[in-house]
Amino acid sequence: MPSIVVLAGSPSATSRTAAVLDLLALRLTGHGHDVRVVPIRELPPGPLLAADAHHPAIADVVEAVATARGLIVASPVYKAAYTGLLKAFLDLLPQYALSGKTVLPLVTGGDPAYVLAVDYALRPVLASMGAHVGQGYFVLDQLISVGPAAGSTLAPAAERPLLSIVDAFSEAVASFRPVTVTV
């Protein structure tokens, strides 16, 4: 089972969010983690919107989340918050599905004002699901260069601090100790 699941909440196949996640997955794999990137847009829309957690494709991702040691939950900012696509997936998970897990929230957006989406939109939802929410990060769209396969890059102003946060996240996941929570 993957030690880290990356939930990609962008509805676009060529998103800047996905480009950043590809770079992070490569970094985490280099640290020895098993990483599974899940583009939520590829899940079947009917079962996703109906919150059918028993549909095979949905159940597979729910199981991956349940067994992961850590998660990166990422989304572009739409209307000052994370995407409805990501919200639809989070809504079908059990209330405390992220209990005891280390989670890194990541948001991309076109305006520096959207940095607030990390702490005021995404973080509260993840915390309400029991996650240990680590340092989040916002990447300004203009600092992301999307290229062909393996050709995406981040400007140094975004890359250095983000990789530092990802390295700390990697260490937290590596030192993971299961916690049993009785509700």
Predicted regions and their residues:
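Glycine-rich phosphate/pyrophosphate-binding loop and the adjoining helix
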Residues: 132-183
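Short, glycine-/small-residue-rich phosphate/pyrophosphate-handling segment
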Residues: 103-144, 156-160
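Short coil/turn segments at secondary-structure junctions
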Residues: 8, 73, 105-109, 149, ...
